[in-house]
């Protein structure tokens, strides 16, 4: 509804849409659970605590354990069972698929309105999440699993699909959008535009 109203205006628009999932608790409509065979879901490839690591870099999954409906409790001293780990990962995957479908609805509406080819789309997450990695179920660690987040951008008139592994930060999104929109970037920003990386992954932002 909001997109339809904005598309009728003569000025460029910016719409921010926030989705709560896949935040705890891991709940999603049944049809998204049914997309997966729980027995085929892989476990974490790095389930154990790295040797010699300072445990202050990790935690005992307090937020996760705070949800009383959980069947088991996670801790650094003992992993949850493989059966329960698969159940949890299944739930997380279902939440991701649910949100993926919601993002799809927005893109479908942009296409229906004829705005898709003139709209920059950013899918952005604020943190990663341990799914049993290093025995943690949650965020708030110093591990890459927690610190790395989702960032997907679709820029009009770009036919390339590029996967880029260079490091950027959330504070770089604003100056990037400003440059893409042809707007002067204010002085004194902490972030830097990474528009060059959108065209060539070998470039340095």
Residue positions per predicted region:
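Active-site-proximal cap/lid insertion segments
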Residues: 2-11, 16-167, 180-188
